[in-house]
Amino acid sequence: MSYLYKAFGWVLDLCYKIVPNYLVAILLFALIIKIVMFPLGIKQQKNSQKQARLRPKELAIRKKYAGRNDKATQQKAQQEIMELYQKENYSMFGGCLPLLIQFPIIIALYNVIRNPLQYMLGIAGDNLTKIQEIFMSLTGAERVMTDLEMMPTIRANFSEFAAYMNGITLDKVPSFNIGAFDLSVTPNASGVSNWYLLIPILTFVFAFGSMKLTKKFTYQAPQAEGTNNALSMKIMDITMPLFSAWIAYTLPSVIGVYWMFQNVLSTVQQIILSQMFKIPKFTEEDYKQAERELAGSSKKNKKAEKAH
């Protein structure tokens, strides 16, 4: 992971050098990362497209067992659906690999953003430890969670830290001030202006809006009757944005800002992918044809069983 941290840190530092405004640099950084990960989005969309093509046949199977909620019947329906997937060379887990690949990348991204001294400026080891000790001495803090929380103190008292900054001058230290806002400030910190509460509130709004919009451009697989999937999805629609807001409330404001940018870019990406790889639409006749094919297949199987 350390190589990934260094690579992302180099990209973020390059963005800041190109545009010496941290808000714009974060947006540029988020855009670059989204472009790099775009092929994973393509793979997911293609997998959804393939699943959507099987929708009439899958719904025909579910309709065949509709109204019978006993365990044996539900297992039989699920078995037939899995056999359909196997026959059509569709894997339910085909869309999981991109998500699994993205997970460590997301962790690396947030670590890089939270620790600019280490990953943007390359300060580590004894020098970083000494900087942390000076920070705690000046502020009375008992510990240091991230580099971001030290940045305002370092800029305000740069002479105290200069000897341990690897020759980096004050003008090279990233400024997190955007107008009256300091993006290195944590919204739940004591003595912080209530205006910083806008960050977690907006993070929730962006996350919730992005989730709703993305769903409109994403294939939604049919659910079996009598399951709790619909309720679970509704709960997720609220809990995930709330989780985003909590993270934005308890971590430096720049994390919330980055999360907002990512939500916007993810929504735009899904809209683009939905146009590149369109989900097929079916008529009522298509669904009836699938039911007739299923009925015909069932009759053939029964005849074959009797013959044996």
Model-derived features: where do they sit?
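Helix-loop-helix
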Residues: 1-308
